[in-house]
Design a protein with these regions (language model features):
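Long, charged all-alpha helical bundle/coiled-coil segments in cytosolic proteins
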Residues: 51-105
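Single conserved hydrophobic/aromatic residue that forms the stacking wall/gate
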Residues: 1-8, 12
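Cationic, histidine-enriched alpha-helical/coil surfaces that engage anionic ligands
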Residues: 10, 16-27, 46, 64-65, ...
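Inward-facing hydrophobic residues that define packing positions of alpha-helical scaffold repeats
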Residues: 26, 52, 59, 144-147, ...
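Long amphipathic all-alpha helical oligomerization modules
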Residues: 137-206
Length: 206
């Protein structure tokens, strides 16, 4: 019959195996990336970089394994792992002296790179708020400027959604995060100005 003569059963079997393997490896990469971001948030940059290197090795291994099973498998489901690893890489570069290299960048699809960058910029909101709590408003403003730069870059990518794979939605979400962060910093600045005026007034009447 047509099913057996064309080997369709074997094709689907290979694709199923590739999908199951890809999902498993993608989950591992996502977990590694999340731990890297948490380490970077705690300013444990050495461990964050160590985890990124582990994630890159896992990604390279995963790609080889998937290709060995099927060259035609649709790896869309695998892109989440790529994106999360990109987020970890960009976030570490945003908050430390970690250098981005072409060797690392070339590992990823354009979609994973841009979405990962956007999510890393969103993660800077937490970093900015931490600095507000530490009364380091200048650093908070620096992170806000960096978030704005990422938004500007993403808005310059003028291609259909089918090509960018949902980048416009990701950009809109980041823009919303940026505006909330801007509002928080503005309130903190106004509070500081008020406190300074009160302190100046109290000194005058003392």
């Amino acid at each position: 019959d047509v099913w057996s003569s064309r080997g369709l059963g074997d094709v689907y079997k290979r694709q199923h195996l590739a999908r199951e393997l890809g999902l498993s490896l993608s989950r591992e990469i996502i977990g590694i990336s999340s731990r890297s971001i948490r380490s970077a948030q705690r300013k444990d940059f050495k461990n964050a970089e160590k985890l990124i290197n582990e994630g890159i090795k896992k990604l390279n291994s995963a790609n080889k394994k998937l290709k060995s099973i099927s060259l035609d498998i649709n790896t869309t489901f695998f892109l989440d792992g790529e994106k999360e690893l990109c987020e970890a890489i960009f976030f570490l570069s945003f908050v430390s002296n970690y250098k981005l290299t072409s060797t690392k960048i070339d590992l990823f699809s354009p979609s994973s790179l841009l979405k990962g960058m956007a999510e890393a910029a969103s993660e800077l909101r937490r970093t900015s708020l931490d600095n507000i709590r530490e009364n380091n408003l200048k650093m908070s403003e620096n992170y806000l400027d960096l978030m704005n730069e990422v938004v500007d870059l993403l808005e310059s990518i003028d291609y259909p959604e089918g090509v960018t794979q949902g980048l416009r939605r990701t950009t809109d979400q980041l823009r919303s995060v940026v505006e909330r962060t801007r509002g928080d910093i503005t309130i903190a600045l106004q509070r500081n100005q008020l406190e300074e005026k009160i302190e100046t007034f109290l000194k005058k009447i003392d």
